[in-house]
Amino acid sequence: MNVLIFGPNGSGKGTQGSLVKDRYNLAHIESGAIFRNHIKQGTELGQKAKAYIDQGELVPDDITIPMVLEVLKNEGKDGWLLDGFPRNLTQAKKLWEALQEEGINLDCVIEIQLDRQEAKDRIMGRRLCENDPNHPNNVAIDAIKPDGDTCRVCGGALKSRSDDQDEDAIDKRHDIYYDTQNGTLAAAYFFKDLARQGKTRYIELDGARDIQTIKNDLLNQL
């Protein structure tokens, strides 16, 4: 199974993506890791990408798309979950064209929907446990709200990430994601149109619900 997943930062996309990955034994392919792997291995594409990154510039799509495909064909040969790409409408169209040319199926697209303000509140409400950062603690979500400054799972001390408290940075990321004309949601809606044509499946999930309810809904639809 090959799956593409969308969701704003703060929507629980990582949690639900891990569920799908583990359930179907998929390779979790995250956009940032693609660049890191190619650069670390010194591939031709990696060297080209590094030149742009070192100059603080965005890597062009004609380099990014082949890098993504290479990882999908190798690491994801037995099935993949692609997370964090595409980020805009142009990339979505180019990715779809490339998949078609390579004869790679896109079996399912998952979109986790969440109101922008709620997503921001969740990001700013995240707290990390000193013993295990994966312990769920968030002052903005009643189901996983910690007891003061201690972890609700183990009692360890909690702290917040500095970037989680940077409203300007959060707003910039969300400006890109919630852009329905050219941004990430525009990319998601491109695949939604393909699903209407019977070319893939499109699953919409209400990210405002609790984790277990979203999980059950996702598994039922898969």
Residue ranges: model-predicted function:
Residues 1-222:
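Glycine-rich phosphate-binding loop of ATP-dependent small-molecule kinases
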